[in-house]
Amino acid sequence: MDIFGVLSLIGGLAIFLYGMDLLGEGLTGASGGKLEKILEKLTSNPLKAVLLGAGVTAVIQSSSATTVMVVGFVNSGIMKLSQAVGVIMGANIGTTITSWILSLTGIESSNIFISLLKPTSFSPVLAAVGIVFLMFLKKDSLKNPGKIMIGFALLMYGMDAMSSSVAPLAEVPQFASILTAFSNPVLGMLAGMLFTAIIQSSSASVGILQALCSTGILSYATALPIIMGQNIGTCVTALLSSIGATKNGKRAAIIHLYFNVIGTVTFMIVFYALNAVIHFSFLNLTAQEFGIAVIHTAFNIITTAYLLPLRKVLEKLAYATIKLDDDEKRIMDSRSGNEFALLDDRFLEAPSLAVEHCKQVINKMADISRESLFISMSLIGGYDEEQALRVGELETRADKYEDALGTYIMKISTKNLKKEDSEMLNVMLHCIGDFERISDHACNLCDSARELQQKNMQFSPKAETELDILSSAVREAVDISFDAFKSNNKNEADKVEPLEELIDTLAVELKARHIRRLREGKCTIELGFAHSDILNNLERVADHCSNIAVDVIQSDQLEFDAHEYLDRIKNKDNQQFARDYKTYKEKYRLPETRSFK
C-alpha cells in the first residue's frame, strides 16, 4: 500500500464521516426535533426507554450524541438516572443501523434487479437528486430529504473509497500477520477500543472494519473481538462531555462505560468458553459486510437483554463510584438551585430541543417578572417590608435570567436552525429585555410604596380608587401579553395594543386630575411626585407589554415594521381595534368622567 493508497484511505474516511454527519443532520431535521423532545419526556418504563434510545440513535446516526444528550438531561434534572440506563442501552442497538446500511455494499449478483440494490448503482442518482433539493429548494422541509440523499451517497462513496484503498493489503504478508494477531481476543478488543476512542464513532469504526472485508483476509475470528472493543471505545465521547457536569451527569456517563465494559467482558468470556467446547466454525470464515452487521447487532441486543434486568445494579455501581454527598443532597432538595440547568451546552447539538428549553426558562422568567410586579403594585395600598424584600430578590433573579438566556440564545443562533426555531429565537431575544425591564419597574414601584410608608404619606380615597383602576388595566395587559407569548397566540396578542392605548389615556387623565387636586390644596407637592412616579412606571410596564405582543405578532414575518403596524391598527378605520378599545374603556371607567374621553 503506497502513499496514494494511504491518502485515498484518509480521503475515503473523511467523506464517510461527513456523509454520516450529513445523513444524521437530514434525518434529525426531517424529524423536526420531535424525537429529542419525546426523549426528554421519557417515561420510567425501561423497555420504552430502550426502544426510544434505539430510535433516536438510528435517526441521528450517533450513539455518542444520544449518550451526550442523556448526560445533559440527567445533569439538568430532566431525566432520572434510572431512566437514563434504558436509553443508553437502546443507543447501542440504534447505532448498528449504519452497519446494516453499509452491508449493502457487499451485494454481489449477476441478476440486474439484485445488482440495483447495491448502493454504488443508485448512489450517483441520489446525489444528483439531493443536490437539486439542497440548492434549488428554499423550504427546510424539502432541503432535509436532499441532505439525507447526499449524506447516503457520500457514505457509500466513502465506503467504496476505503474498500478500494485497502484492497491491495491482501497482498501484504505483514498485514495478514497483524490481522491474525488481532484474532487474540484481548489484542483485538484493545485495538477496536483504541481506534474507536480516537475517531469517537463506533459506526465509523465498524464501517472501516467492513471496508477491510474487501481484502479477503479478514476473518470473523479477528473481526469479533475488534467489534467488542469498539463498543468500549465509543464511551470516550460521553466521558469527555461529563467533564464539568453535576455528579449525576457524571454518573450517567459512568453507567454508559460500565454497561459496555461489563457487557463486552461477560459476552467474550461466555462466547470463548463455549467456543472451547463447541468450536464455532464460522470464526474461520472470511468476514463479509453483512456478517459484521449481524455480529454488531446481535452483540448489542444480547448484552441489552441480559443487562436490562440488572439496570438497578448498574445504577448502584455508578453511585458507588461517584458517591452522593451532603451538598448534592441539599442542591437536589432545593427548588431554585438548578434554575438554568436546562441551558446546558450539551443540548446545543439538538438545536430544536435547545430552543424549547430556552422557551421553558424564559417562561419562568416571565412568571418572576409578573410576580414581582403584582407584589409591588399591592404594596402601594399597604406596604410590607417582607414583601418588598421579595420584590428585590425576584428582580435579582430576573437579571440573572436575562444574562443566562442572552448568552445561551447567542450560542444557539450559531447552529443550523429550522425557520420556525430561528423565528422563535428572535422573539425570545427581544422579549427577555422587556421581561427584565418590567421587574425593574416593579422595584421602582416598590421604592415609591416604601417612600409613602416612611414619610407617612397617603393618597386621597379618590386618588387610590383611580390608581386601583389603572393598576387593574395594567394587570390585564401583563396577563394577556405574557400568556400570548407563552402560547405564541397572535389573536391574544392583538388585544394588547387597544388596552395599552387606554392605559396611556388613563395615565394622562390621572395626571390631570392630580394636578387639579394640587391646585385645590387637596394634595401636597411631595405626594404629587410619588403619584407621578407610580403613573410613569405603570405606563412603562404597559409599553413593554405592547413590545412583547408586537414581537409575538411579527414572529413569522421576515419584513415587519413595528411602527407601521402600530399606526395601522390604531387607524380610525380599524373596527376591531375600536371595538376592543371601547370594551376596555367601559371596563376601566373612572368614577369622574367629565374630562375623560
Label every model-predicted segment.
Residues 8-21, 53-57, 125-137, 150-162, ...:
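Hydrophobic core segments of alpha-helical transmembrane domains in multi-pass membrane transport
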Residues 1-7, 109-121, 175-180, 221, ...:
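Interfacial loop-to-helix junctions that mark the boundaries of transmembrane helices
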Residues 59-66, 85-102, 119-126, 155, ...:
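Membrane-embedded alpha-helical segments of transport systems
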Residues 33, 37, 41, 45, ...:
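Alpha-helical transmembrane segments of multi-pass membrane proteins, especially transporters
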Residues 69-91, 99-121, 196-233, 242-248, ...:
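Membrane-interfacial helix-loop connectors
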Residues 79, 105, 218, 244-250, ...:
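Cytosolic, long alpha-helical scaffolding segments
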Residues 1-46, 145-194, 212-215:
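Helix-loop-helix hairpins and the membrane-proximal interhelical loops
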Residues 24-28, 57-65, 166-167, 195-204, ...:
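Short helix-coil transition sites and intra-membrane helix breaks within transmembrane domains
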